[in-house]
Amino acid sequence: MAKLTKDELIEAFKEMTLIELSEFVKEFEEVFDVTAAAPVAAVAAAPGAEGGAAAEEKDEFDVVLEDAGAKKIGVIKVVREIVSGLGLKEAKELVEGAPKAILEGASKDDAEAAKTKLEEAGAKVSLK
């Protein structure tokens, strides 16, 4: 098997959907017995590191779909609006797999707008 360069891997990842990337990460974690989560010590040290900096507002948010509610079809439509390039099948799998992150690293305005749209469609959503 030919060895792929970093650039070739990045290009391959660019062509994958959000769900395909999520499945890849899960399989990668299982095969290599690692986790993609940030170390707890690094996360715990950050808030106390600069006293006043902890009071600053977060500028990146994850929009997490906690539950689709009774109106799944409406929620699926909104998910397709929010996540560009997502097909009907992928959006359905994402909604049915709740709780799942819909957007990651979104600005406050984008995260709030997505949360509002999803809640109007009947979903339970949280920002992290």
Curated annotation (Swiss-Prot):
One of its GO terms (molecular function) is structural constituent of ribosome. It comes from the Bacteria. One of its GO terms (cellular component) is cytosolic large ribosomal subunit. The keyword Nucleotide-binding does not apply. GO terms for biological process: translation. Keywords: Ribonucleoprotein, Ribosomal protein. NCBIfam families: L12. Homodimer. Part of the ribosomal stalk of the 50S ribosomal subunit. Forms a multimeric L10(L12)X complex, where L10 forms an elongated spine to which 2 to 4 L12 dimers bind in a sequential fashion. Binds GTP-bound translation factors. Forms part of the ribosomal stalk which helps the ribosome interact with GTP-bound translation factors. Is thus essential for accurate translation. Belongs to the bacterial ribosomal protein bL12 family. This is Large ribosomal subunit protein bL12. The lineage of its organism: Bacteria, Bacillati, Actinomycetota, Actinomycetes, Mycobacteriales. The gene is rplL.
